[in-house]
Swiss-Prot record:
Compartmental location: Cytoplasm
This protein's name: Trans-aconitate 2-methyltransferase
UniProt main location, coarse: cytoplasm
Function noted in UniProt: Catalyzes the S-adenosylmethionine monomethyl esterification of trans-aconitate.
Record Pfam families: Methyltransf_25
Residues that span the membrane, as ranges: none
Sample GO molecular function, one term: trans-aconitate 2-methyltransferase activity
Any single Gene Ontology cellular-component annotation: cytoplasm
Keyword Acyltransferase: no
Top-level EC class as recorded in UniProt: transferase
Catalytic activity, as annotated: trans-aconitate + S-adenosyl-L-methionine = (E)-3-(methoxycarbonyl)pent-2-enedioate + S-adenosyl-L-homocysteine
UniProt family annotation: Belongs to the methyltransferase superfamily. Tam family.
Taxonomy, superkingdom: Bacteria
Length: 252
């Protein structure tokens, strides 16, 4: 897969950071020592963690060399490791595992989430936020365009669901706080929606296409977005973006 583009990702930095801020606000830990930021990207979520716990040892994990380089440049006081979340092993038990908009890219959450809980110290916390927009027009249309143009399905899997995550984490020995929030982002144009998803959800669909194929895909995608997202009275577009939040505290 082609590498992530930090500049494109940070184009909507405020919108992408807001869920991390709101997730962090629900983590009731005080003096903690070891933190992992899984899927840290360019370090915007890591910066929030460092601001709240400046004395903690924070390790950011990401599989993208470009994202890791950007994060290291922005936060020289934190450790950043290029690794696959599924294979990375900390040197010590973690007081907090923070995963903002990263775990949705990984398969088999029935195994992944108990594994992450096993990395926590007693009373440690797993804090997770995942986009829950698999059924939103932005993502449904990606699949429809790919089908129209005879491209394979390269999208991520849908989330397991609120009840499934509650059971998975309860059985792993956690107290679970889980909620879902829908954000309505004001977009100036349909092209702005494409700019947003090109940095994330559209990447797998476009990565193996030629430049002309990508343009053909995006032209059709733009047409379909216009049909699904009407303009407001002031010309703006409201982009609904549901997100699932989980704060699980280990009790064992």
């Amino acid at each position: 897969m082609s590498d992530w583009n930090p500049s494109l990702y940070l184009h909507f930095a405020a919108e992408r950071s807001r869920p991390a801020v709101e997730l962090l606000a629900r983590v009731s830990l005080e003096n903690i020592e070891y933190i992992a930021d899984l899927g840290c990207g360019p370090g915007n979520s890591t910066a929030l963690l460092h601001q709240r716990w400046p004395a903690a040892r924070i390790t950011g994990i990401d599989s993208s060399p470009a994202m890791i380089a950007e994060a290291r440049s922005a936060l020289p006081d934190c450790l950043f490791v290029e690794a696959d979340i599924r294979n990375w092993q900390p040197e010590q038990a973690l007081d907090l595992i923070f995963a903002n908009a990263s775990l949705q890219w990984l398969p088999d959450h029935y195994e992944l989430f108990p594994h992450l809980v096993s990395l926590l110290s007693p009373l440690g916390v797993l804090a997770v936020q995942m986009p829950d927009n698999w059924l939103e027009p932005t993502h449904v249309l990606m699949r429809e365009v790919a089908w129209e143009q005879n491209y394979p399905d390269r999208g991520r899997e849908p989330l397991a669901g609120v009840h499934a995550y509650y059971d998975i984490l309860s059985e792993a020995g956690c107290e679970v706080d889980i909620w879902r929030t829908t954000y309505y982002h004001q977009m100036p144009s349909h092209q702005a929606i494409i700019d947003w998803v090109t940095a994330t959800g559209l990447r797998p669909w476009l990565q193996d296409l030629t430049e002309s194929e990508q343009q053909h895909f995006l032209t059709r995608y733009h047409q379909m977005l216009e049909e699904q997202y009407p303009l407001q009275e002031n010309g703006q577009i409201l982009l609904a973006f549901p997100r699932l939040f989980i704060v699980a505290r280990r009790t064992e």
